[in-house]
Amino acid sequence: MLTGLGGAFCYLCNYSKEQCNTFDYVKAGFPVDRSLEQTKQICEEKWHLLENRKPNDYKVRQGVTKEPITNEEHLTLHPLHSYLRVFGWIYKICYHAVAGHFNWSESKFEGISKIQGVNNLIESKRKIQKCVEEEINVALEKPDPTGHGGTSTTGNVVKTLLNTNNRTLLTKHISDVSLKENIDKIILYVSIIFWPVNSNSKINVEKYSVLCQKTMMLVMSVKWIRFTPYCSCK
């Protein structure tokens, strides 16, 4: 619902992609303030229709491309879905770093052809997959062996990699020591952020918020990494 030309960045708030990657906004935090009623109002004004969409029309359309199919507010995030989507973001960071491709785009390459650049990324994925398989016998990002579609990267696989010291296998082949250290910290902090999600234990919300902001600041310090909508929401 919230994707497409000039789309919204997050389905829980009204901030844009640029704002979600801006220091001052990150420091202030992002309140969950997007309502179903707002989305319905946009649809009533027909801003979601294809013929009415315009480039950079974020303020009026806010990413809405279809009328909502629900009549209830849904402000919760499912833990498993969060794990899988955020792991995809982490995996992209890692294989870009291994390839030495310091750009979030996978279609723009400096000094080499697009074919060579894509091949470098594919080879970097293979390096990480091989490392994980040899060290802990886990198949990462392979076709689903059960034949049900999707990939072998299940929730259990993600937890095995993020919630243990196995997470360093993802960054083992990053040659830039400083970059490797930063990405190791990012993965560690993200894993800590996820730990309380399925827990009934009480946490210090203020400290938790500080950790989330610290993580976002660390990500922003690596200039070529971009927050995806999935990662921003989670």
What are these regions (language model features)?
Residues M1-K234:
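A structural signal for the principal folded core domain
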